């Protein structure tokens, strides 16, 4: 016997969370809980403002339609990426496809203070990897900060994310301030320039490896070996159903690229599922999931070790 619940939620964010030049005051989303007999599966649907093509309201309409179809024994997944992902996660839990084992390690987001980063990395097992957002300030400043971090912590590897912020000139200004001897310890720089051609040229000219992120979601993107490209960063909430995520990981691995499962600022429930997806599809690769600290609360499933309070399902607004 199939049954389902849909919940709507809104989580206050810490001050200072800015996405694409707009402040994110709350993180808005939905949960779906599917039941079939004794089995249960959850999924999160939370389009990311400025990045997702669909809005929260559009996702809600599509989710409710899909749930009603599922209750009538239709198993086709919705097209909308966030709804397809959340629905497929709920189904994967329900059927036991999504393993319980999780990789709760996370590459810490660094604000540029090497002393703070040293403390955060001290307890980190294995490779020391951190992430730095670049492109928000002057490119020269970014280059100096990255150089300082790599100089201060000799076994550090950095993942950098520019979100296509730089012109080719700005990207070169950044690289100029990073010691060539340290550049191999930049694991990758996500999407430095506005076009893929400019980003590839930057990688060839500087020896700094790059990764694709936004490009994966463009209709003309194809997986191919390219000089200077070392990784792809996959954000499942923006990608679609789990099968599509699996296909992208497989395509990347077939080319010898690193595939990184990354957060779209999901709630704790969504983050714990991403940790499981990472352990399942990209074992041994540190996922990019260090975003829970941007929120003021957790929901339904807490992240291990987090001190944030956690709401249970009864405290959420139920739509169905």
Swiss-Prot record:
Binding sites annotated in the UniProt record for Mg(2+): 161, 190, 213
Keywords of this protein's UniProt record, alphabetized?
Lyase, Magnesium, Menaquinone biosynthesis, Metal-binding
One of the protein's GO biological processes: menaquinone biosynthetic process
Short name of any one Pfam family annotated for the protein: MR_MLE_C
Q: Which family does it belong to?
A: Belongs to the mandelate racemase/muconate lactonizing enzyme family. MenC type 1 subfamily.
Which transformation does this protein catalyse, written as a reaction? (1R,6R)-6-hydroxy-2-succinyl-cyclohexa-2,4-diene-1-carboxylate = 2-succinylbenzoate + H2O
Q: In which pathway does it act?
A: Quinol/quinone metabolism; 1,4-dihydroxy-2-naphthoate biosynthesis; 1,4-dihydroxy-2-naphthoate from chorismate: step 4/7; Quinol/quinone metabolism; menaquinone biosynthesis
Q: Which domain of life is it from?
A: Bacteria
Q: What name has this protein been given in UniProt?
A: o-succinylbenzoate synthase
Give the function comment from the record: Converts 2-succinyl-6-hydroxy-2,4-cyclohexadiene-1-carboxylate (SHCHC) to 2-succinylbenzoate (OSB).
HAMAP family, per database record: MenC_1
This enzyme's EC code(s): 4.2.1.113
| UniProt keyword Lyase present | yes
């Amino acid at each position: 016997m199939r049954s389902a619940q849909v919940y709507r939620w809104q989580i206050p964010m810490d001050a200072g969370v800015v996405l694409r030049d707009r402040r994110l005051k709350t993180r808005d989303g939905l949960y779906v809980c599917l039941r079939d007999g004794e089995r249960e599966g959850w999924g999160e649907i939370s389009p990311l403002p400025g990045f997702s093509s669909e809005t929260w309201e559009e996702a809600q309409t599509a989710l409710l339609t899909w749930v009603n179809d599922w209750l009538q024994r239709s198993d086709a997944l919705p097209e909308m990426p966030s709804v397809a992902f959340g629905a497929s996660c709920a189904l994967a839990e329900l059927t036991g496809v999504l393993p319980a084992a999780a990789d709760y390690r996370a590459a810490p987001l660094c604000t540029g203070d090497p002393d703070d980063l040293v403390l955060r990395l001290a307890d980190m097992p294995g490779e020391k990897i951190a992430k730095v957002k670049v492109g928000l300030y002057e490119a020269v400043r970014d280059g100096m900060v990255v150089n300082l971090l790599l100089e201060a912590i000799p076994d550090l590897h950095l993942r950098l994310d520019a979100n296509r912020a730089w012109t080719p000139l700005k990207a070169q200004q950044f690289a100029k301030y990073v010691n060539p001897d340290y550049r191999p310890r930049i694991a990758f720089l996500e999407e430095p320039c506005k076009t893929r051609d400019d980003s590839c040229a930057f990688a060839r000219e500087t020896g700094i490896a790059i990764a694709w992120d936004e490009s994966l979601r463009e209709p003309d993107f194809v997986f191919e070996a390219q000089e200077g490209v070392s990784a792809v960063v996959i954000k499942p909430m923006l990608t679609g159903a789990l099968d599509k995520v699996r296909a992208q990981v497989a395509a990347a691995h077939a080319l010898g690229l690193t595939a990184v499962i990354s957060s779209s600022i999901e709630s704790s429930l969504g983050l714990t599922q991403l940790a499981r997806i990472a352990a399942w599809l990209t074992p041994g690769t540190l996922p990019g999931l260090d975003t829970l600290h941007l929120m003021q609360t957790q929901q339904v499933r807490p992240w291990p070790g987090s001190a944030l309070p956690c709401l249970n399902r009864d405290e959420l607004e139920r739509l169905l």
